Amino acid sequence: MTGYTNRIICGCVAACLLAGAGPFSSPLYQAQTVSNPSTQPTPPTQQPEPIKIYTEEVLLPVVATDSSGRFDPTLEADDLLILEDGQPQTIRSIRRIPASVLLLLDTGGFRNPAMKTNATRDLAMRVVSQLRSGDQVAALQFGGKVELIQSWTAEPEVAIHSLKSKLSSGRYGRLPDALAAASVQLRNAPPGNRHIVLVTDGGESLIDKADLAAGMKQLFTAQATIHVISYTLLGRKEINVQHRKIPVIAAATTPKSEMDTTVLPIFPNAPEKLAEELKHKSLLRILLTESYPGAIDLDYPVWRHSRDQLKTLKQNEIWLAWLAEETGGDIILPVLAEELPKLADDLAREVDSQYVVTYRPKSGVALKSSEEIRRLEVVSRRVGLHVRSRRSYVVTAPSK
């Protein structure tokens, strides 16, 4: 790793949808009923059969910045080209709406010496203080059990007070449980511009793939973009400093062939093309082939425990990268604890650089009888404009 913050900007799977039901998408279909018109009076014993009208609209979060990385306030429909499965779409609207930001704060980190509750609290308060006026915030902590410490509020001082008075240290935090609780909490926030700021190291043991997949499915229904600030790199560095006594002669590496068995099964239903893209991303390649930066301690049990922790943190880094990747967010890997305030500012700026673009898909889904995945591509048509958005979304047939 280099001596500066590692920040990976990610695309996303599962677009923010207005309407639909199913394991991956929230209601994409809005059904209205109207009376069946008739020129003859209807006998009292007969009821007119209602007609269902499905209104389909995709809400697509798009980040727009200029060549210097600053928010571009001049975005117009003619500046963008949206392709769905290669087919150009007609943009109906571009607007900015207040963000709903759920802080999901891991207060465990019992065996990660770099993970401090005070640092997490300061980071969260900094994010809240830097958000745009009108944004609303809620906060969940998980360090044993998942606990709501602040319900939705548009008053930053209220959220900051709750973070100061209620955030407390725990021992073990289970990320899948926290994701499930977050999806429930996000149902109370308006759709279109929902975010999760996840501060964690992934937990004390390797994240179970089945549990993570279940949590991800629920998050897809909540339409949330996840931004991860990970303590994994800081933790690995700190463990090596504490237990460096005899250098490792031959450091262990993860074979490249393990890419398939380690990464891809997290979401076995991912389309093949997407899986290939993710498999070859530089982040995952680095995480899976980088030598564990370890050292042998003279006390073998201590060394073995530290070695296991290094492996766990590194593996969790992979899952967290996937988590951000699948939801259109980013993962930030601070190298120094002193970087956290600036990272909080950058993250708040990222949240508030987002537009909500809407279009009606040319390939309707109201008559679909099975689940399908649609590929998305958002392209800038204007020189100097940089845009980023989700890469696909999953739709299912509407309930009859």
Regions found by a protein language model. Name each.
Residues 10-23:
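Bacterial N-terminal signal peptides
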Residues 1-6:
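N-terminal secretory signal peptides that target proteins for export/translocation
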